Amino acid sequence: MDPLIQELTKEQLRDDMPDFRAGDTVRVHVRVVEGTHERIQMFEGVVIKRKGAGISATYTVRKMSSGIGVERTFPVNDPRVAKVEVLRHGRVRRAKLYYLRERHGKAARIAEKRRG
């Protein structure tokens, strides 16, 4: 890659993002602008995938809302994301957890990673 492009993208990378992977439960604080009013909206769920690297990296969070699965994809370096909190680290054996889309209730649970 061109050194000039590398330098420009390095300036735009966020360094305040916590370390999280697929299977972790996170709470994403998103800035929502409605007219002139700005507020923070939280989206809490399980990270089902991380994709890409550098400036174009994204992650997808899935949650259940009134029995309906809702997935939202966020760029890692999105300025609209105020903060990401990692609530628990899940123990999974896959990088992409697409199988959670077919599971409901207790079958969709993810075991918590043991400390040690």
UniProtKB/Swiss-Prot annotation:
<protein>
    <recommendedName>
        <fullName>Large ribosomal subunit protein bL19</fullName>
    </recommendedName>
</protein>
<comment type="function">
    <text>This protein is located at the 30S-50S ribosomal subunit interface and may play a role in the structure and function of the aminoacyl-tRNA binding site.</text>
</comment>
<keyword id="KW-0687">Ribonucleoprotein</keyword>
<dbReference type="InterPro" id="IPR001857">
    <property type="entry name" value="Ribosomal_bL19"/>
</dbReference>
<dbReference type="GO" id="GO:0003735">
    <property type="term" value="F:structural constituent of ribosome"/>
</dbReference>
<dbReference type="InterPro" id="IPR018257">
    <property type="entry name" value="Ribosomal_bL19_CS"/>
</dbReference>
<comment type="similarity">
    <text>Belongs to the bacterial ribosomal protein bL19 family.</text>
</comment>
<keyword id="KW-0689">Ribosomal protein</keyword>
<dbReference type="Pfam" id="PF01245">
    <property type="entry name" value="Ribosomal_L19"/>
</dbReference>
<dbReference type="GO" id="GO:0022625">
    <property type="term" value="C:cytosolic large ribosomal subunit"/>
</dbReference>
<dbReference type="InterPro" id="IPR038657">
    <property type="entry name" value="Ribosomal_bL19_sf"/>
</dbReference>
<dbReference type="GO" id="GO:0006412">
    <property type="term" value="P:translation"/>
</dbReference>
<dbReference type="InterPro" id="IPR008991">
    <property type="entry name" value="Translation_prot_SH3-like_sf"/>
</dbReference>
